Amino acid sequence: NLRPHWLPGQGRERDRGPAGHRATEGDFVDFAREYFAWQTGNVYGVRIAGGPDASTLIGTSTLGDFEEARERTHIGWTAYSPEVWGTVVNPEAKLLMLGLAFDHGFGRVKLQADAVNDRSRAAIAKLGATFEGIVRRDQPRADGSWRDAAVYSILATEWPTVRAGLEARLAEHGAEPI
C-alpha cells in the first residue's frame, strides 16, 4: 500500500527531485503533465510484476532527448515510490531502457541528477555510469532556487560490462517480486 508521496513533509527537499512535492494529488497531476517529456520522449510506467501487489504503479522513467544524428539520448525524469528505493526496481528498469537505447544504435546515454541529491547520484553511479561533471544552474526547482546537475553517461562500448553488472545484481535478488 503506497502512500501519497506528492504531499509536503514526506522527505528531505533534496531527495524530491527537481520539482519537489505538491500540496494535493491534483497539483501533482498538473505538475506531471508539464514535467515529463511527453512530446519528446518515451515515458514508461514502472509496475510491480508479481506477488500480491502485482500491477501496482511504483514509478516512472523516460527515454528522451533523442539526438539520432549525434547517436545520443537521455534516461531521466525518474521517480519511484520511496518503498522501492534501494531495491532492484531501478536497476531492472534501467537495464531494459539502456538495452533499448543501445539496441537502437545510440552511442551515448546520459543520466543526471540534482547535484545535492546524494541518493540519486549513488544509484546512477551504481548502475555503472561514468561521472562527467556538474552543469551549473541547470534548471529551476519548485522553490525557485536553481539546480546544478550532476551528469553521468554510459557509452555503447561500455554497455556490455554495464549490462553484465546489472544482470548480476538482478540474479542476486532472484525471481521473487520486491
Predicted ranges, named:
Residues 125-135:
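Conserved acetyl-CoA-binding loop of GNAT-fold acetyltransferases
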Residues 111-121:
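Conserved beta-strand-loop-alpha-helix junction that forms the acyl-donor binding cleft
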Residues 74, 92, 108, 119, ...:
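Amphipathic alpha-helical recognition patches that constitute DNA-binding helices
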Residues 120, 143-144:
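Short Asp/Glu-rich motifs
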Residues 1-87, 100-104, 109, 139, ...:
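GNAT-family acyltransferases
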Residues 86-100, 122, 126:
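Conserved acetyl-CoA-binding loop-helix of GNAT-fold acetyltransferases
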Residues 117, 128, 148:
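Acidic active-site catalytic centers that drive phospho-/nucleotidyl reactions
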